[in-house]
């Protein structure tokens, strides 16, 4: 028993040392790793479709622009990071195209119209192996997120529409996008209105066209549920 425990302890120590060294190596040699990746990177699916990155701060109409582009095609898919946002976009598309032509797929919730042509999904739930004339991914700067970054990175590298692809997000990712997709068209968006602080408010008594922003996913759903029940 002691012998087996000793082997286990040595294994844990070795693993911890390797993990610590790996993190140190990544930290000190990050530029070399990126350089190696870029030298050896080859897109897995080359496409002749239009590819644009629409970049700018919040409240610049990026998502609205993507929806306008999507409904101009016979089929389309958009991936967004939040289920609530997916639901909002779904409702908007249903009001334009009708419920029979729209799909909502968030992993937890799936509503599929009888003649569905337009898909609204959380980024993780975007259908693999299905072709669309138009494809968009929102908040593409989440490529840098520790937990979900691999999903957004995969979409950036591999997901394309037949005729048009849009990546929406912050300007912080512009440099990386240009390196990965050299011929991409960058579209910059300016804020459409001015944001200002108006003091503390009672969240149950907010007026129409009020935006509630929280930086915790759990709090977003909690606030949304509170607003629904307080109406």
Predicted segments, located by residue:
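Pre-Walker A adenine-sensing motif
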Residues: 36-45, 65-67
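Walker A/P-loop
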Residues: 49-65
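Walker A/P-loop NTP-binding motif
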Residues: 63-75
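Conserved strand-helix element at the start of the C-terminal RecA-like helicase core
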Residues: 75-86, 207-227
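Inter-Walker segment of RecA-like/P-loop motor cores
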Residues: 96-128
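Loop/turn-to-beta-strand initiation segments
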Residues: 116-118, 131-134, 162-166
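Walker B catalytic acidic pair
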Residues: 138-140
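Post-DEXD/H (motif II) to motif III coupling segment of the RecA-like Helicase ATP-binding lobe
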Residues: 144-196
């Amino acid at each position: 028993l002691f012998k087996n425990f000793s082997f286990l302890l040595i294994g844990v120590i070795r693993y911890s040392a390797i993990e610590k060294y790996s993190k140190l190596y990544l930290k000190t040699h990050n530029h070399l790793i990126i350089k190696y990746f870029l030298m050896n990177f080859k897109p897995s699916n080359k496409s002749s479709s239009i590819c644009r990155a629409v970049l700018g701060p919040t409240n610049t109409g990026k998502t609205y622009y993507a929806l306008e582009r999507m409904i101009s095609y016979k089929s389309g898919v958009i991936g967004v990071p939040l289920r609530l946002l997916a639901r909002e976009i779904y409702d908007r598309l249903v009001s334009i195209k009708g419920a029979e032509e729209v799909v909502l797929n968030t992993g937890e919730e799936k509503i599929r119209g009888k003649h569905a042509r337009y898909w609204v999904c959380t980024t993780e739930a975007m259908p693999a192996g299905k072709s669309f004339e138009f494809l968009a991914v929102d908040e593409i700067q989440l490529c840098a997120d520790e937990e979900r970054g691999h999903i957004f990175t995969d979409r950036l590298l591999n997901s394309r529409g037949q005729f048009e692809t849009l990546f929406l997000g912050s300007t912080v990712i512009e440099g990386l996008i240009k390196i990965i997709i050299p011929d991409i068209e960058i579209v910059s968006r300016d804020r459409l209105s001015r944001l200002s602080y108006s003091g503390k408010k009672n969240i149950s008594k907010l007026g129409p066209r009020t935006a509630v922003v929280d930086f915790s996913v759990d709090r977003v759903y909690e606030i949304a549920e509170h607003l629904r029940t307080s109406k």
